[in-house]
């Protein structure tokens, strides 16, 4: 029985979509894999490690619209002819983080539903790519970021990781800080998003540290909260 369960687990964790414009280097689709890789995925450690002259140019943009409500991930693969492949992944209506830590092998049948990314794909023309890259440039999206900026899981924020012509870049934007005043690219990117889940727009909320999850028992309201901290050229190690 243990061998069967182990094989089932391996099959579940090994499922990787091959329908994207170009295959991403990390699989963050399945919930257990995402719980292990999510922070390094947002930090784009894979992109940074492979960023060198002569390599492929690509960007990863993460829109965290309150972790438990919605997250949208955009992978942009720039092509030599000026076009680009855009892969879109959306997580919506996620359960509290405590559920991830409580998953057991016997619950394999339950982990592939609401936790799976809904996916979309677009091929952008050279003109569309030019407009998008221009809006990113106007947003200072290629860095440097504000050192020490905090990104709580239950806030609205963006991160942009990039490798362009072998040059690494990183930027982050936190909605409560400046109401996304410097984010010039969001509407352009959302216009390319063909996943049939409405974008969770930023809204004014009380400070993240004061908010509680009513579904958690008393004393556990903040136990599963997490926060990312921006460094001089990327996310600080957790």
Set out the residue ranges of the language-model regions.
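Positively charged n-region of N-terminal signal peptides that target proteins for export
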Residues: 1-4
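Function-determining sites in protein domains
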Residues: 22-238
């Amino acid at each position: 029985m243990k061998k069967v369960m182990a094989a089932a687990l391996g099959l579940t964790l090994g499922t990787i979509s091959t329908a994207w414009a170009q295959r991403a280097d990390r699989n963050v689709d399945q919930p257990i894999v995402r719980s292990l890789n999510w922070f390094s995925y947002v930090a784009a450690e894979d992109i940074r490690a492979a960023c060198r002259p002569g390599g492929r140019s690509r960007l990863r943009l993460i829109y965290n619209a309150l972790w438990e409500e919605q997250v949208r991930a955009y992978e942009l693969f720039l092509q030599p002819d000026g076009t680009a492949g855009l892969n879109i992944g959306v997580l919506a209506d996620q359960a509290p983080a405590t559920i991830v830590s409580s998953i057991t092998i016997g619950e394999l049948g339950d982990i592939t539903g609401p936790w799976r990314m809904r996916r979309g794909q677009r091929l952008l023309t050279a003109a569309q790519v030019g407009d998008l890259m221009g809006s990113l440039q106007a947003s200072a999206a290629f860095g440097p970021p504000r050192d020490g900026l905090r990104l709580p899981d239950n806030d609205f924020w963006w991160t942009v990781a990039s490798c362009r012509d072998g040059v690494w870049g990183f930027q982050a934007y936190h909605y409560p800080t400046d109401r996304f005043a410097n984010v010039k690219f969001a509407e352009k990117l959302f216009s390319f998003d063909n996943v049939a889940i409405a974008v969770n727009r930023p809204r004014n909320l009380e400070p993240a540290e004061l908010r509680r999850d009513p579904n958690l028992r008393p004393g556990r309201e903040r136990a599963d909260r997490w926060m990312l901290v921006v460094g001089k050229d990327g996310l600080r190690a957790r």
